[in-house]
Regions:
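Short Gly/aromatic-enriched secondary-structure transition segments
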Residues: 39-47
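Extended, low-polarity transmembrane helix blocks
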Residues: 1-38, 50-69, 75-143
């Protein structure tokens, strides 16, 4: 007797990740200019700060611009590319945090990198969907 399995709607997985990895980098990037959420420079390891040709706060302004760009990429025409950048970026942030001994936050950022990777793969699956079918019609995952 054949078993029937419910079909997985990839769009239901894609949308929350798309929103998360669009808005979180955008808001975190904006906050690099205001330091409302936290004092961002304290998360920059001293050895890295010593390598910078600028002040840590100026460096974080550049980081903020990159994060804003990544968030906008995810939310607009380039979600796949933005998600890949976010995944790599989060791994680098986790490495920096680990050098500060902030392992709990580093592990969180590594988990977020896995989510960004998942978003990138889902975005690829959406791009591969037949042109005749709307993205919401994509129901099966490719492994």
């Amino acid at each position: 007797m054949p078993t029937t399995q419910p079909r997985l709607n990839l769009e239901s997985l894609y949308r929350p990740l798309w929103l998360t990895y669009g808005l979180v980098p955008l808001l975190a990037g904006l906050d690099k200019f205001f330091n409302l959420l936290t004092d961002w420079p304290k998360y920059l390891s001293p050895w890295m700060a010593n390598l910078l040709p600028m002040s840590p706060q100026t460096f974080l302004y550049l980081v903020g611009i990159i994060e804003i760009a990544v968030g906008l990429m995810v939310l607009t025409r380039w979600p796949r590319l933005g998600a890949w950048i976010a995944a790599a970026w989060l791994v680098l942030i986790a490495l920096n945090l680990a050098t500060l001994g902030l392992f709990d936050i580093a592990v969180r950022d590594l988990a977020m990198a896995v989510g960004a990777y998942t978003l990138a793969r889902l975005a690829e699956a959406r791009q591969e969907a037949p042109a005749a079918a709307p993205a919401s019609a994509l129901r099966e995952s490719r492994v």
